[in-house]
């Protein structure tokens, strides 16, 4: 049995709905408020720790990935984690927060962006994105795509540091990440999980600069997990939002830099939420494992809740029989 530890990388707290409270360093330590993301909302720049209505603002509270203090804090957590007898460490949520394109517009991010481009942004944030922008604008501000490139660089450079930190403690521990397989829109999270050999701008010129590819981080990983979270009726097919298509795209995007496992969300994706899908499990396994280097499922609690054990055994047995033929 191999043991891999997953860490909620840039999450600093959680606000629960239904008056159930909150937890995390961002809530425990008021002095860390400056570590939280700042969102470029329609109402103006807003620290996400000022958004505390548990009916509308519940969910994870993210750190600003560009904050050096945040990065040092997380790197120390990884160093501590690497001291345990683990086979691997997987970074989850190593990205910008769920506000997507609206994050992060802190003074720190502004300063680092200006240092990166060697210019002063005279009209911030409007020269990057108008307040409340949550999708590609038809009329792009002057720094829009360069800002997306910068965000990808922030995450890329942290991945490099994180790998170095883990390996410095225990070089035998494998280092990897979990990401969503929907690459065509994953730029909203500030992540380029592809190989740097994949020329992103050739396929996505609306949002990728010619240098965006330089911040693909697949070549810094020992493995990667791709969430192929298609609906129960979109298991086979091509293109995104089919499980098979997600995994086939993943192979093209990763360019052989790193082995990868694709897998479904069997508890939250459309058609999976109420259980009763045992007959679909073997197909989901086949679609993913036949087009990647492995398989994972999100999440074990759903396997137990809906008693999918036999369905998984059937799927794995079919796969093992197919490779023995």
Where are these regions (language model features)?
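Aromatic-lined substrate-binding rim segments of carbohydrate-active enzymes
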Residues: 1-14, 77, 143-169
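Active-site-adjacent "subsite" loops/lids of carbohydrate-active enzymes
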Residues: 4-84, 136, 140-144
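Active-site beta-loop-alpha junctions enriched in small/polar residues
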Residues: 8-12, 93-96, 180-184, 229-231, ...
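The substrate-binding groove and active-site-proximal loops of carbohydrate-active enzymes
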Residues: 56-75, 141-156, 229-238, 266-272
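An active-site-proximal structural segment forming one wall of the substrate-binding cleft
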Residues: 62-96, 156-158, 165, 213-216, ...
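Active-site-proximal loop/short-helix segments
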Residues: 84-143, 182-188
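Substrate-binding cleft/loops of secretory-pathway carbohydrate-active enzymes
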Residues: 99, 169-239, 273-274
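Substrate-binding cleft of secreted/luminal carbohydrate-active enzymes
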Residues: 209-325
């Amino acid at each position: 049995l191999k043991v891999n530890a997953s860490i909620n990388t840039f999450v600093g707290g959680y606000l629960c709905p239904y008056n159930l409270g909150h937890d995390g360093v961002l809530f425990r330590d008021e002095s860390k408020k400056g570590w939280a993301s700042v969102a470029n909302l329609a109402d103006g720049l807003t620290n996400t720790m000022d958004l505390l209505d548990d009916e509308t603002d519940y969910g994870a509270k993210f750190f600003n990935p560009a904050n050096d203090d945040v990065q040092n804090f997380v790197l120390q957590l990884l160093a501590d984690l690497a001291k345990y007898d683990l086979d691997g460490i997987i970074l989850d949520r190593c990205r910008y927060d769920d506000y997507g394109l609206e994050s992060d517009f802190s003074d720190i991010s502004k300063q680092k962006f200006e240092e990166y481009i060697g210019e002063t942004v005279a009209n911030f944030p409007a020269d990057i994105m108008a307040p409340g922008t949550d999708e590609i604008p038809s009329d792009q501000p002057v720094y829009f795509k360069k800002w997306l490139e910068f965000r990808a660089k922030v995450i890329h450079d942290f991945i490099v540091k994180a790998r170095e930190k883990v390996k410095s403690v225990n070089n035998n521990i494998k280092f990897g990440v979990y990401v969503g397989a929907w690459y065509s829109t994953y730029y909203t999270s500030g992540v380029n999980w592809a190989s740097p050999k994949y020329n992103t701008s050739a396929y996505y010129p609306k949002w990728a600069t010619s240098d965006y590819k330089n911040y693909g981080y697949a070549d810094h990983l020992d493995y990667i997990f791709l969430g192929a979270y298609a609906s129960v009726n979109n298991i086979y097919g091509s293109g995104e939002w089919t499980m098979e298509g997600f995994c086939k795209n993943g192979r093209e995007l990763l360019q052989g830099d790193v082995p990868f496992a694709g897998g479904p969300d069997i508890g939250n994706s459309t058609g999976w939420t109420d259980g009763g899908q045992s007959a679909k499990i073997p197909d989901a396994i086949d679609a993913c494992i036949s087009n990647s280097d492995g398989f994972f499922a999100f999440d074990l609690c759903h396997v137990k809740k809906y008693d999918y054990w036999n369905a998984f055994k059937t799927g794995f047995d079919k796969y093992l029989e197919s490779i023995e033929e």
